[in-house]
C-alpha cells in the first residue's frame, strides 16, 4: 500500500537554509530519529489523519532547523569573538615589542652620547674637562 503526500506539505530545498556539513548531518540524524518515533504513532488505516501528522512533523523539522541555525550562529559568534581577542592580543604584543625596541634604541643612543665625551679626548688628545664642558654645552637641554 503506497501513501501519497501532497506536495504543499513537503519542505523544498529553498525552505531550508544551508548549514555546515557536520551540523547538517547531526540535525538530519536527530530529525530522522524524531520523525521515526512520530511515524510509529501514525495509524496507517486512518489515511485522513496522515496530513495532520505530516504538518506536525514539518513544524518540528522547521523548529529544529531554526534551533540548529541559532546554535551555529552562536558558535560562529564565539569563534569570531575569540579571533578578534586573539588579534587584539597579537596587536598589543607587537605594539609592546615596538615600544620596547624604541625604548632600547633610545637608551642605546643615550649611552652613545654619554660615552662620546670619554672617548673623544683620548683621540684628540685634549683635556677631558674642557671637551666635556664643550660637548654638553652644545647639546640641547632635553637630551641631557
Swiss-Prot record:
Any one GO cellular component localisation term in the record: membrane
Membrane topology designation: Multi-pass membrane protein
Primary location: membrane
Chain segments annotated as transmembrane: 27-47, 49-69, 83-103, 106-126
Cellular compartment(s): Membrane
Keywords assigned: Membrane, Transmembrane, Transmembrane helix
Note: Almost completely overlaps CTR1.
Annotated protein name in UniProt: Putative uncharacterized protein YPR123C
Organism of this sequence: Saccharomyces cerevisiae (strain ATCC 204508 / S288c)
Amino acid at each position: 500500500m503506497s501513501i501519497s503526500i501532497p506536495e504543499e506539505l513537503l519542505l523544498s530545498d529553498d525552505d531550508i537554509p544551508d548549514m555546515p556539513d557536520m551540523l547538517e548531518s547531526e540535525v538530519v540524524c536527530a530529525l530522522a530519529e524524531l520523525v521515526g518515533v512520530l511515524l510509529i504513532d501514525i495509524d496507517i488505516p486512518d489515511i485522513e489523519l496522515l496530513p495532520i501528522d505530516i504538518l506536525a512533523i514539518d513544524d518540528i523539522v522547521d523548529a529544529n532547523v531554526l534551533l540548529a541555525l541559532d546554535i551555529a550562529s552562536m558558535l560562529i559568534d564565539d569563534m569570531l569573538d575569540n579571533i578578534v581577542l586573539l588579534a587584539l592580543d597579537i596587536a598589543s604584543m607587537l605594539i609592546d615589542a615596538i615600544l620596547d625596541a624604541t625604548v632600547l634604541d633610545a637608551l642605546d643612543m643615550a649611552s652613545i652620547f654619554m660615552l662620546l665625551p670619554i672617548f673623544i679626548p683620548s683621540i684628540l688628545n685634549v683635556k677631558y674637562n674642557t671637551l666635556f664642558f664643550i660637548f654638553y654645552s652644545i647639546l640641547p637641554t632635553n637630551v641631557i
